[in-house]
UniProtKB/Swiss-Prot annotation:
GO terms for biological process: positive regulation of development of symbiont in host; secretory granule organization. The active site is at 137 (proton donor). Mn(2+) 2 binds at residues 101, 136, 196. Transmembrane segments: none annotated. This is Shewanella-like protein phosphatase 1. Belongs to the metallophosphoesterase superfamily. SLP family.
Length: 362
């Protein structure tokens, strides 16, 4: 903590002694961020992680907002053959991307993350990978904003002690802070961009790695804007965690919003954008701009649907893009696929699958 404070003092002293006119304000921050990262690297090499050019030759599975619903998550992972009956990873050469918002509303956010971190380690042994993206609800928790936390979660996983939970998320040495702060807000895999909230013409002036780094640094700065950065506020609705103007408006102004989308995709040399955050009222994956823009927050959590889960996932395999919808029921006699979940609750689901092809129309 002392090292961190001293580092910021040195940075601000540097700014104070720079003569006016020596350089433009917008040109200062790259040097400052570079030196900040070099110093912090001594403590945490994750500041140098790059997410702007990940190459993957196998299948990709993308999952949207979970909001504490571990049953929907496990139904997806079982159906897509990523985990077995014992909840261990079994998928060969598969990339799983979870697009943020694991926490809040539901109860099981903490054990979902523990489970996903476990799968990250297991997947490596199967030539697979799990990428977890930061959502705005992860950011809210890291910033100490707990308005969406289910009280039952505090009771079950934090000894019914809100202060204990606060320490776990807000204190830099807290159990969940240490792990969640490393999650990237934005990732590019092949020609696909994944981010939680969305993109806009303003934020897309920055590189993926700059967005990830500066979003993290603002959270570490007590979630306050960093004064010497020209963009200022990465936790606002202009930042990738919250930006939803495109996803909210594209159903009504598709031509205009798709024009913006393709400008942004060209900037990043990408063809597709996958976002969560904006709940789809149909409980199915939304697709716009000739299947180049996918909205995968289907409001799946049973905690927001009176106990009814709506699990969906995006599957990309052999250049084929499909939305997979799982129609879930509890039936004694199941004419479809029966999936037995054993933890945290022993429950049997009858699952019917519906797939929609989402490749662009040529």
């Amino acid at each position: 903590m002392i090292f961190k404070k001293a580092l910021y003092i040195l940075l601000f002293l540097y700014i104070a002694i720079v003569k006016k006119g020596e350089s433009k304000p917008g040109s200062k921050h790259p040097f400052l961020f570079k030196n900040l990262v070099i110093d912090k690297k001594k403590l945490d090499s994750s500041y140098y992680n790059k997410y702007d050019n990940i190459k993957w030759n196998g299948k990709i599975i993308a999952i949207g907002d979970i909001h504490g619903d571990i049953e929907s998550l496990k139904l997806i992972l079982r159906h897509s053959k990523l985990i077995g009956e014992n909840d261990n990873w079994i998928g060969d050469n598969v990339l799983l991307v979870q697009n943020g918002d694991v926490f809040d509303r539901g109860i099981y956010g903490p054990i979902i993350y523990n489970f996903l971190f476990k799968l990250q380690k297991e997947a490596i042994k199967k030539n697979s990978r799990v990428i977890l993206i930061m959502g705005n609800h992860e950011q809210l928790n890291l910033c100490g904003y707990f308005n969406y936390v289910n009280p039952k979660e505090i009771e079950m996983f934090f000894h019914n002690d809100a202060n204990y939970r606060y320490h776990s998320f807000v204190n830099p040495y807290g159990e969940y802070h240490k792990r969640l702060i490393r999650l990237p807000p934005m990732v590019k895999v092949n020609n696909i961009i994944f981010t939680h909230g969305g993109l806009n013409l303003l934020i897309s002036k920055l590189s993926i790695n700059d967005i990830n780094l500066k979003t993290r640094l603002q959270i570490e700065n007590n979630c306050k804007p960093i004064k010497y950065d020209s963009f200022q506020n990465y936790l606002s609705r202009d930042g990738v965690l919250w930006s939803d103007a495109m996803s909210r408006n594209v159903p009504y102004y598709e031509k205009e919003k798709c024009s913006e989308l393709f400008q942004i995709l060209d900037k990043y040399d990408a063809k597709y954008l996958v976002v969560g955050h904006t709940r789809q009222p149909s409980h199915q994956i939304g697709s716009y701009c000739n299947n180049h823009y996918f909205l995968i927050d289907t409001g799946m959590s049973l905690f927001t649907n009176y106990g009814q889960p709506y699990p969906n996932y995006l599957k990309i395999d052999d250049h084929k893009i499909k939305a997979v919808r799982l129609i879930v029921e509890k039936k004694k006699k199941c004419p479809h696929t029966e999936i037995q979940l054993n933890t945290p609750n022993k429950i049997k689901y009858c699952v019917q699958e519906s797939q929609t092809n989402l490749n662009p129309v040529l």
